[in-house]
């Protein structure tokens, strides 16, 4: 047998070799196979329950993919970008420079009710003095947008609106070198160009971009000049440790066409009342981020960041009823008002996440510290030139207001995620804020000793949330979280000698509460949420007379409000065949926001506003869309409806002579966007905004950029070419 075995092996190997030779000498003709399909688009997802050092379990949230959208990205069209987020109120009047948005009946001005972040880095200009975000992100540089409602606020801040986090693109990990170019042109002489470069050098990744955009406006005397730059360098010495250096800058100069009265708007919404007004923010955001995966169950993140920049404003600041014309005597224009804010905001944030087991259940605890040191230097009421161009030089070196608003605040936060069963988990959290804001400086028309000098912020904030998985892809979730909002710099500055500030004035505070049902069933995706938003210590003005019978106004906390509503997101899709897909969705919010108590000055009288509706809270915001996909082509139709709402707390129906107050009429807008992906390297986008040329406005601002009607854009279109190498 031993002698036979080698012989058998030889025969087997020899036959195998011979068979291979025979096969190699034969040629087989195979039928061709065509693989057909439709390019998959999953624009909206939910955040993972545990993501990085954050706990999102039990929170209302959205995760939006910008790279898959049929939307106007270069002009930051918020109603298209956030179309699948129920109840997003869009205040669109600034030519694509800023996204003014809010949810749940809050103020949309530059997103200042949100904790605004880019890659986890705070981009609110000054969280305590002026929380508006003046940094203008080129959305071509953004991969996706994360949005978390206010019930998750304990982990990142105390804002009523919640958090918006823009997640940037990075270098393509599959390539040593990558390049992107996103060029757009369109109506109103739109020209936009975005270029990015990425590289991978073993342990180092680099991504950098340049963006430029020029655009005239829908209205006369409206123009935008914009540019932005950014660079990101990531060094990963090990797979568990990374150090990230990031610098981003944005600049834009916007020529404002001025407010209109209602009669002007209905006669011709494209006309302007100003030709010499300008707005110019220049913002720098440097940061360093350290991420360390200490063990499979432990993560740490440290961020040191700053926001440094200026906000320049040049205005002939009068109502629309007063013309900005040449004086017949001097044969010159009147002097313009110059205002300059200088932001110096610094944030240090340490976060830690620990996973631990209790029996067979996995639990997580997240905690950290946040230190903010801000100095907002505000110079206002400067006497500017009589020129028509952008010129921030003063003809008189004395500012009407020259003030510093310095804040130092520290916050400690912790949140624990407990798995009670495999399907049911509870989160319990707390945040403690302690700090102080100090105001000092001069106001030429006001005694120095009567300016409020110190405001303390000390708040213990509590919250809880839960999630219960009914089935694999369905869950009930809910939560409650306390919130607060610091008083803004502008609310503490008396506008005249006849105005006084309550020395016991308080920050606004309240809570968010919600309960929802979300998931997927066959071809249907859904998320339905009921919410309450309590907003106490709202700020306003009262009228009084002193002992000598002199009239004066008094700025103080005037009352409380409650907004309640339902947010509905429904989306269904059907594969008609291998290459055709149809998607329809509805994204709506039904809201009722009212003052539960309050008194406000009207003329020389104080009026009770209890039961009145809150400003800029429409009863219904609804967006409905349909997308048809064929192979690599898609076309999307979006219908947006916003119900009428009030511009002031008195619920004034008839417009005032200046257009500053009155009902904001309901409006509906239709947008069409298409995308054609030629191959992996080349893509075309064509869009028409406001297809039916609806003439509308979304808000009557009571302060900047001027009281009155600010028309939104009429019909306009754009073509974009996207090249990726």
Where do the language-model regions lie?
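Gram-negative outer-membrane beta-barrel transporters
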Residues: 352, 422, 530-534, 552-650, ...
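A beta-strand signature from Gram-negative outer-membrane beta-barrel systems
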Residues: 137-180
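Face-selective signature of the C-terminal outer-membrane beta-barrel domain
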Residues: 239-248, 281-319, 323, 327-442, ...
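Conserved C-terminal beta-signal and adjacent last beta-strands/turns
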Residues: 248, 478, 582-590, 610-725
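Short acidic/polar hinge/loop motifs at secondary-structure boundaries
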Residues: 89, 121-149
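Transmembrane beta-barrel wall of Gram-negative outer-membrane proteins
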Residues: 185-214, 219-255, 278-298, 431
């Amino acid at each position: 047998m031993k002698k036979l075995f080698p012989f058998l092996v030889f025969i087997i190997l020899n036959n195998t070799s011979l068979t291979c030779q025979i096969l190699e000498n034969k040629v087989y003709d195979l039928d061709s196979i065509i693989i057909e399909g439709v390019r998959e688009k999953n624009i909206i997802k939910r955040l993972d329950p545990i993501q990085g050092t954050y706990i999102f379990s039990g929170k209302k949230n959205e995760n939006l993919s910008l790279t898959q959208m049929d939307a106007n990205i270069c002009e930051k069209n918020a109603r298209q970008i956030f179309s699948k987020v129920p109840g997003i109120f869009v205040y669109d009047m600034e030519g694509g420079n800023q996204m003014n948005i809010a949810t749940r009946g809050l103020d949309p001005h530059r997103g200042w009710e949100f904790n605004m972040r880019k890659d986890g880095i705070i981009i609110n200009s000054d969280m305590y003095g002026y929380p508006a975000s003046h940094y203008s992100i080129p959305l071509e540089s953004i991969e996706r947008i994360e949005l978390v409602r206010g019930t998750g606020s304990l982990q990142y801040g105390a804002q009523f609106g919640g958090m918006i986090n823009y997640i940037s693109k990075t270098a393509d990990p599959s390539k040593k070198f990558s390049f992107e170019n996103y060029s757009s042109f369109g109506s109103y002489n739109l020209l936009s160009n975005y270029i990015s470069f990425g590289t991978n050098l073993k342990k180092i990744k680099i991504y950098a971009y340049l963006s430029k955009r020029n655009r005239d406006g829908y209205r006369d005397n409206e123009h935008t000049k914009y540019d932005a730059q950014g660079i990101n360098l990531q060094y990963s010495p090990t797979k568990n440790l990374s150090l990230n250096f990031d610098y981003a800058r944005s600049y834009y100069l916007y020529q404002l066409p001025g407010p209109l009265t209602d009669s002007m708007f209905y006669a011709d919404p494209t006309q302007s009342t100003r030709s010499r007004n300008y707005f110019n923010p220049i913002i720098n955001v440097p940061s360093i981020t350290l991420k360390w995966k200490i063990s499979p169950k432990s993560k740490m993140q440290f961020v040191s960041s700053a926001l440094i920049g200026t906000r320049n404003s040049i205005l002939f600041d009068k109502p629309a009823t007063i013309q900005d014309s040449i004086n017949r005597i001097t044969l010159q224009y009147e002097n313009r008002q110059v205002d300059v804010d200088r932001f110096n905001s610094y944030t240090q944030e340490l976060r830690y996440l620990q996973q631990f087991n209790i029996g067979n259940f996995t639990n997580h605890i997240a905690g950290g510290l946040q230190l903010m040191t801000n100095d907002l230097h505000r110079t206002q009421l400067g006497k500017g030139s009589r020129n028509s161009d952008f010129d921030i030089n003063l003809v008189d070196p004395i500012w009407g207001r020259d003030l510093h608003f310095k804040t130092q605040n520290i916050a400690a936060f912790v949140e624990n995620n407990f798995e009670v069963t495999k399907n049911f988990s509870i989160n319990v959290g707390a945040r403690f804020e302690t700090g102080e804001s100090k105001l000092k400086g001069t106001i030429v028309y006001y005694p120095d000793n009567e300016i409020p000098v110190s405001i303390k912020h000390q708040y213990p904030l509590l919250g809880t949330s839960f999630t219960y998985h009914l089935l694999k892809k369905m869950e009930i979730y809910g939560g409650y979280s306390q919130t607060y909002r610091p008083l803004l710099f502008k609310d503490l500055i008396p506008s005249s000698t006849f105005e006084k500030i309550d020395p016991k004035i308080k920050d606004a505070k309240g809570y968010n509460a919600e309960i929802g049902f979300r998931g997927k069933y066959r071809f249907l995706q859904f998320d339905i949420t009921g919410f309450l938003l309590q907003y106490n210590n709202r700020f306003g003005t009262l009228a009084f007379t002193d002992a000598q019978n002199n009239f004066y106004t008094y700025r103080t906390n005037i009352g409380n409000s409650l907004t309640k509503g339902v947010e509905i997101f429904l989306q269904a899709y059907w594969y008609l065949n291998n290459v055709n897909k149809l998607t329809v969705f509805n994204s709506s919010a039904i809201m009722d926001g009212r003052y539960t108590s309050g008194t406000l000055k009207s003329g020389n009288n104080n009026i009770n506003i209890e039961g009145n509706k809150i400003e800029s809270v429409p009863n219904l915001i609804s967006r409905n869309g349909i997308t048809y996909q064929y192979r690599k082509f898609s076309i999307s139709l979006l219908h947006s409806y916003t119900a009428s709402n009030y511009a002031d707390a008195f619920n004034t129906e008839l417009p005032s002579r200046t257009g500053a107050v009155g009902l904001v009429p309901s409006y509906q807008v239709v947008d069409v966007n298409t995308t054609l992906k030629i191959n992996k390297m080349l893509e075309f986008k064509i869009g028409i905004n406001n297809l039916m040329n609806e003439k509308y406005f979304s808000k009557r601002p009571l302060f900047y950029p001027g009281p009155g009607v600010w028309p939104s854009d009429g019909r306009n279109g754009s073509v974009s070419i996207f090249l990726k190498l």
